[in-house]
Amino acid sequence: MQQWIEPYAGFELTSTLLSVEASYQAEKLTALGIDPDYYRGWVDPAFFIGISIQAGIDSGISAEGNVNMLTRLKVLRAPKLDEPMRVKGKIESVTEVPRGLRISTNVTFETTTGETLISVPRESLKPMAKASDSPTAGRGAGSRPPPVIQSTSDLEIREDRELRPEQTLGYSREGNAIHYDEAVAQQAGFRAPIIGGGQGVHYLTRAFWKLGGQSDWEIYFRRPIFWDDHIQVGCLANHEGLALCRGEKVLTEVAVRS
């Protein structure tokens, strides 16, 4: 049985070499209904959200039940498919909040010569098993940045996406069963499994990322997206804000810094 390490500030992730293989990207994007040929040999940056979480799992930090709240996806130099990269990372802080532990992690991906390609700082919530386990009273996961999108009526809708459970099952990997196990998701308080944050961001990178370009996105996961939701992909007229929405509700939003 896996012996997990309780997260603590200063914990360094195991440094490993990896690459995003063309066959892997094709398999996962096809599962989501995205044509992998669109990327023309570039890695879809949305993959680095899941890969950075997996780096923690591989280092002994459980992701089971954790909720991704904020991810910054900064592409300094876009990697190509099958390009070798070294992953490094560190837990910067662990803070007690009413709902559990708020964990700040920074993961970077470098070339074999040390050039930083992508950095992925992340804020996640590790919920307590039950309310009485929480180290602080009340509810909440700590401070929340102000919204990027004031109203979904401000968005220019680019496309509609009808999500299907088989898409999430085909995309997800083991590590956090709330994404693929109905019983676990319901036990966590969700009516159905919720998609991982990275899955939703694939719809945004497909619509708005300039192939091979630098970018700096601050991604806020505001509300859960269920694996059978109907969502819309949109942006502000100035392209400084992107979003996945459902009706009048913003589900995931992005502050585009560059």
Write out the residue ranges for each language-model feature.
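A conserved acidic, glycine/proline-rich C-terminal tail/linker
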Residues: L204-V233
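Hot-dog-fold acyl-thioester-processing enzymes
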Residues: M1-L70, T136-G142, P146-G212
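Small beta-barrel nucleic-acid-binding modules, principally OB-folds
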Residues: A63-A78, G213-R222
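HotDog/MaoC-like acyl-thioester-processing domains
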Residues: Q2-P7, L70-D160, P224-W227, Q232-S258
